[in-house]
């Protein structure tokens, strides 16, 4: 029950984050602000995550029920606050800040829920479900924004999202009261100090910096990049294809690689495919070809998120799972900010923009090569 409610809430955080991304032109006219100001409604989320990720993770490890409930309440309250003035930029911005404050408490819970409520052999699947929920929320935001806006304006769009979010928030607040089925070792100190010298966690963080950074940069700049080749109009569909492929990959790959103990090999494949994918797009600009490339890219790249989170929970243990997830997602969000800005600086030349994405992935190849080849030898294999 709690995983279903959590999955819905996690999806809603992405839905609220990206509310205005597919309707930027219409929204800036309705609110009477610039398109850049509308973009800031999504841009505040990764910045807030960088600030709040670590303290949120520590609170979740220390007081899980209270912390996740607070995240659910903030998410629901932010969704409702936007309804105070759907066409008022001030009200909408205030609501986005509230949602952004709750998002780290929700997303950092993904491995903690798996560790508290599922036996070891089912935790990989639970983490995969949570990750699939995130990507489903992204896809729902991209596909539903324009139809709801056309049907009833900003009020209908924000009302529909708020209603769904409140249902999810109430569901989580109620279900999180269920006592944990599996308890960690109370002797393990809940702190953040262990992260400083943990080489393995820093390698995983570097990979998420690259992976989430590449995805955010593609979602932000693909239309502009393809516009140089006369294919800008296809960008929305191509991003949807990449995200849908990521949902499929996140649903099937993590369990397979965990069962075969091939986590490093999968992560190496993900970054290697990324290097090749954007070089291929730079070489051939056919929309159908780009769609095929981004399908493969999304399938492996987005599936890397649950693989990394699953591996981090094995390494950190149930007692520190939320802090580990917070650290990794902080790195991912920071990567989103940095790579978006790097590509922005090169956006006048599409070949340089695509080359920057491949270069970032090449750094990921070097990081992945330094991970342990297998986890069983390090006592990190899931129980059968």
Residue map of PLM features:
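A late C-terminal transmembrane helix in Major Facilitator Superfamily
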Residues: 313-349, 357
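Extracytoplasmic gate region of multi-pass secondary transporters
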Residues: 20-21, 200-250
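Cytoplasmic helix-loop-helix junction between adjacent transmembrane helices
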Residues: 95-133
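Helix-loop-helix hairpin linking two adjacent transmembrane segments in secondary transporters
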Residues: 129-177
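Helix-to-loop junctions at the C-terminal end of transmembrane segments
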Residues: 52-64, 249-262
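Juxtamembrane intracellular "pre-TM" segments in multi-pass secondary transporters
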Residues: 177-204
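C-terminal transmembrane helical hairpin of 12-TM major facilitator-type secondary transporters
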Residues: 263-308
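Conserved MFS/SLC helix-loop-helix module at the cytosolic interface between two early adjacent transmembrane helices
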Residues: 51-86
